[in-house]
Regions:
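Alpha-helical transmembrane bundle of multi-pass membrane proteins
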Residues: 1-226, 230-232, 252-472
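Short, well-structured alpha-helical segments
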Residues: 238-250
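Short helix/loop segments within enzyme catalytic domains
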Residues: 234-236
Length: 472
């Protein structure tokens, strides 16, 4: 997805007040892809144990069924930019909405384990598309003065999607009397959990018809008047629209369609800035954040918490995730991206260390001792809070901003794919690692959180307040 932005001379660093509400609506509609991203990613949390028992599978096979969606995510993220540059951002969103719908229906009504895995791959492809198209589209329609905050809508939508999925799972479990395989209208509870995603998927598709195409894409295919009209909608009549159109066209003439070859450097394969993007993406996942959203119900049950309470704690964790994201949205354009990243890394490292200590205790009657159990619950929530107010938001903002125009599309796709591959590695390995040593697993995650601190200090540059043309 190739995007450009106005330079400082354009006078468009802030939207006209009359148009900011319209820009917010457009951003929120596009961020519905993020909502589905969060919902589809974490809804499986409520079905893990039911799938294990329904198909009588061990931890290794179970992990592959859960993690296989991430293969689709990586493919979707790698190809979405090229698809969007060819057919447009809106059409890309509509394709993703259809795939989300198909995945929801198929996952709720699987014939066997193999087709459940297939439906999850399809849903993963849609998630991967949404992970790239959402931030890029939002960056293209957002005035620079608001770009950080509007860019945060994507992560806000993701965490709201996570929270809603956990709330829906908890509600369905209550209806099924606490049994994930309890019958509701002929289907097991876990099938309803996966099938409910049809509702937001259809809403996403409908909203995509209510928002305009990116003016930058329209200019790239020669639709100058349509692009001019949309720029007027999002930036106001007081802006010199002819100058803005000329400015974008000039920037587009200076750049070319990015390809994988453009990312190659003389040392270590990729250009240094691409490695920084990959590093940000990978560190975001290697701290183990998605263990909290894919396996938390199973994790709490493994240390003696009953199923209903484990679902409730999964929901409270997702609420903390929302609170942290709101904090990040408020601070990202005030204190900058790097300070948030460093604060988050420090907080996560400490919280993960406490979790590792708590899980090192021997179980008493199948439960953690009271002190360790309390510490584990508090530390898990603190970990999610520090992730949400930092890496959960700033990585997406960085990836939308940090690359030069000439390589942005390809670099964003590679970085997003790296994120999904790292996510897959953590998701696929956790059940086996937990069987090996739960405390040791959290020590590994704490080490990655600690290593992210020198990485940010040495390699990551601040992007706060810069126009996209200044990057790289």
């Amino acid at each position: 997805v190739t995007s450009t932005s106005q330079g400082p001379e354009s006078g468009a660093r802030a939207a006209h007040p009359d148009h900011l509400g319209h820009v917010i609506f457009i951003t929120a509609a596009a961020a519905m892809g993020g909502f589905l991203f969060g919902y589809d990613s974490s809804v499986i949390n409520g079905a893990v144990e039911a799938i294990r028992h329904r198909y009588d599978i061990g931890s290794g096979t179970l992990a592959q069924v859960i993690a296989i969606a991430l293969i689709g995510c990586a493919i979707g993220a790698a190809t979405a930019g090229r698809i969007a540059d060819r057919i447009g951002r809106i059409r890309c969103m509509q394709i993703a909405a259809v795939l989300f719908t198909i995945s929801a229906v198929g996952s709720a009504l699987p014939f066997a384990l193999w087709d459940l895995a297939m439906w999850r791959i399809i849903g993963g492809f849609a998630i991967g598309m949404a992970s790239v198209i959402g931030p890029a589209y939002i960056a293209e329609v957002s005035p620079p003065a608001y770009r950080g905050r509007l860019g945060s809508f994507q992560q806000a939508a993701i965490v709201i999607g996570i929270a809603v999925s956990q709330l829906v799972n908890y509600g369905i479990l209550q209806i099924a009397d606490g049994d994930q395989r309890g019958k509701i209208a002929g289907l097991e509870a876990w099938q309803w959990m996966l099938g409910v995603m049809v509702v937001p998927a259809v809403l996403y598709g409908l909203l995509s018809f209510a928002i305009p195409e990116s003016p930058r894409f329209l200019l790239s295919i020669g639709k100058r008047e349509r692009a001019r009209k949309i720029l007027e909608e999002v930036e106001g009549k007081n802006v010199d629209l002819d100058a803005r159109v000329e400015e974008i066209e000039t920037a587009m003439r200076r750049e070319h369609k990015s390809s994988f070859r453009d990312l190659l450097g003389s040392r270590f394969g990729f250009l240094p800035i691409v490695w920084v993007g990959i590093g940000l993406s990978v560190f975001q996942q290697l701290v183990g954040i998605n263990v909290a959203f894919y396996y938390s119900a199973t994790l709490w049950q493994s240390v003696g918490i009953d199923p209903t309470d484990s679902f409730f704690y999964s929901f409270t964790t997702s609420i903390i995730n929302i609170i942290g994201t709101v904090i990040a949205m408020v601070l990202v354009d005030r204190v900058g991206r790097r300070p948030l990243a460093l604060a988050g890394s420090c907080g996560m490292a400490v919280a993960l260390a406490f979790e590792a200590w708590a899980f090192s205790a021997d179980l008493v009657d199948g439960k953690l001792p009271t002190t360790q159990g309390t510490v584990a619950l508090i530390a898990a929530h603190v970990f999610v809070l520090f992730f949400a107010l930092s890496w959960g938001v700033i990585v997406w903002v960085f990836l939308g901003e940090m690359f030069p125009n000439r390589i942005r599309a390809a670099a964003l796709g590679v970085a997003a794919s790296a994120q999904w591959i790292a996510n897959w590695a953590i998701t696929a390995s956790f059940p086996s690692l937990a069987d090996w040593n739960l405390s040791g697993t959290y020590i590994i995650y704490a080490c990655f959180a600690t290593l992210s601190i020198p990485f940010v200090i040495k390699f990551v540059k601040e992007t706060k307040g810069k126009a996209l043309e200044e990057m790289g």
